[in-house]
Amino acid sequence: KDIPSFVECNPQFNIDTLVNRIKVQVSSHATKIIYVDNLQLLAYNDANQDHDRYGKVCIQLKKLALELNIVIVVLSGLNRQVEYREGYEAKIPQISDLYGSSKIEGLADIILMVFRPAYYNVYYDMEGNEVQNDFCIHVVKHKNGPLGTIKLIFTKETFSLT
């Protein structure tokens, strides 16, 4: 089934501009899903520290989703700590690896963490199984459902998942 959706990735937007743009999109096109890429690029004028800014942006987006009865999917970068950890399991992103993780964790209904071992030059798991083409989506928070891992195969030549 086709669901009206909209992707916004303009790094010049501040949160107020984005909120207005989303409201217009929803009222004009009956959009049900909004994708925002990415949290760290949204400007918030009155917050001095990054974690304050991320928290305020998350709060505004959560309120907007509830007000408009829509889903807002927000992409977020990871901090650099994961790059310094050694081994397969240590490289799997955790909620604490998200920039502004405490606010994101508190407000999000679902948090998915994407992990592609080859990105970190990890080609074998703890049991010695080849993971070079693995692409894992870890469901690390789900307010109304189960946690777990969805394992896909990444094909580098076609940039596709199966």
Language-model segments: residues:
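Conserved acidic
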Residues: 14, 53, 100
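Generic structural signal for short, solvent-exposed loop/turn connectors between secondary structure elements
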Residues: 45-50, 160-162
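Phosphate-binding/switch region of NTP-binding enzymes
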Residues: 57-162
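Conserved inter-motif catalytic segment of the P-loop NTP-binding fold
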Residues: 1-48, 56
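Secondary-structure capping and boundary motifs in well-ordered enzyme cores
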Residues: 50-53, 131
